[in-house]
Amino acid sequence: MAIRKARIPDAKAIHQLLITYAQQELMLSRSLPDIYEKIRSFYVYEVSGEIVGTVSLQIWWADLAEVRSLAVAEGQMKQGVGRQLVQACLEEARGLGLKKVFALTYQPVFFEKMGFQYIEKAELPQKIWSDCVKCPKFPDCDEIAMSIVL
């Protein structure tokens, strides 16, 4: 088992993981072309050659990034996969000199255990006007905004 930066051949497996969550309305759907375009922002968690988890770090501004598209295969949940993936994003964000990382989530307890705190979505104008306006739930988003200061 290992966490690593995603590569082009991983895109279809990442897409399949994300589709599972999108079909349950737990995250926005991401197209395969979008994943290819942003493959450098993804990490994967691999077990015996199979991708069982993924996450993406989206940079929004000079001091702000988002942990997004966090997905773990059902059989791998509650084993630290998600935590390790988010930790990889936080380490990359620190290395890039970012000061704050946020997430929009339905799993606030998970992020709270990692040191994230609750914030208002209004603190994230770049996200709101770029991604959120495309969401079918906008403006009545039911995800919880959380952030961590690095």
Q: How should each PLM-predicted stretch be described?
A:
Residues 124-150:
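C-terminal "cap" of GNAT-fold acetyltransferases
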Residues 93-106:
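Conserved GNAT acetyl-CoA-binding A-motif
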Residues 105-131:
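Conserved active-site alpha-helix within GNAT-family acetyltransferase domains
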Residues 1-9, 144, 148-150:
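Conserved N-terminal entry element of GNAT/NAT acetyltransferase domains
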Residues 78-91, 103:
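Conserved acetyl-CoA-binding loop-helix of GNAT-fold acetyltransferases
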Residues 70-77, 106-107:
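A short, internal acetyl-CoA/4′-phosphopantetheine-binding micro-motif in the GNAT/acyltransferase core
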Residues 8-9, 16-64, 68, 73:
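Acetyl-CoA-dependent GNAT
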